[in-house]
């Protein structure tokens, strides 16, 4: 399994990622969230372009799915005999041909991919959990549901739904035994800003060792995609630590009386105000 991260909209502030997921053994690939063709296509080799079997969206927002039609047209012109699918969570994803149900299994060459529906940021949000059975490598493409040390805004959902998405749907599908080997590839590079928010919850160095290490990494590296795992998220991401008394206190639950949805909603509101 190989993952190529492609920057999009960094100069305009969007700091999006497109990803080329490849099964190098079978020379097949998926192009995930290629919203900006002029930025994506020059980053692909001719062999990579020919290898694309599907354009894949994590959700329908323009900065993830608006490149579908142009990319599809380009790839068909490049290889007229090939069939390129468009995979997404709803008909709102342009040119979509496959809308997978929750936990639908798909294959890319030898790679096994589970489609985890995570409605909240949008109703059609999907995270794609990938396993390479040959090497046992694993990763997950989380779009705007899970960011490194953060999560997406609840545009079309609630705190309860985001809690379910992060802490049930993703974690339980992947399985605790696989958290430490499942690398996270989010839709945006928001990590540095997220660290500033999380530091308000754990203000002292030493309170959260995982956060300290993430902060140090961010001080030296611009790109964090694929560098951290689900286990890391459970250790430093407050949206995945709702049972932590420090997270509860930061949200305003001083007597441990709030339910998880209330804590999640308040955390998101606090992050929105930053």
Curated annotation (Swiss-Prot):
BP GO annotations: methylglyoxal catabolic process to D-lactate via S-lactoyl-glutathione
Activity modulation: Inhibited by various thiol compounds such as glutathione and coenzyme A.
Coiled coil: none
Cofactors demanded by this protein: Zn(2+)
Family note: Belongs to the metallo-beta-lactamase superfamily. Glyoxalase II family.
Function noted in UniProt: Thiolesterase that catalyzes the hydrolysis of S-D-lactoylglutathione to form glutathione and D-lactic acid. Involved in the metabolism of methylglyoxal, a toxic compound for yeast proliferation, by converting methylglyoxal to lactate via S-D-lactoylglutathione by sequential enzyme reactions catalyzed by glyoxalase I and glyoxalase II.
Additional remarks: Present with 13700 molecules/cell in log phase SD medium.
InterPro entries: Clx_II_MBL (IPR035680), HAGH_C (IPR032282), Metallo-B-lactamas (IPR001279), RibonucZ/Hydroxyglut_hydro (IPR036866)
Phosphoserine carried by residues: 257
Annotated substrate binding sites: 153, 188-190, 268-271
UniProt-listed Enzyme Commission number(s): 3.1.2.6
Binding site for Zn(2+) 1: 59, 61, 121, 144
Residues that hold Zn(2+) 2 according to the record: 63-64, 144, 188
GO terms for MF: hydroxyacylglutathione hydrolase activity; metal ion binding
Name of the protein in question: Hydroxyacylglutathione hydrolase, cytoplasmic isozyme
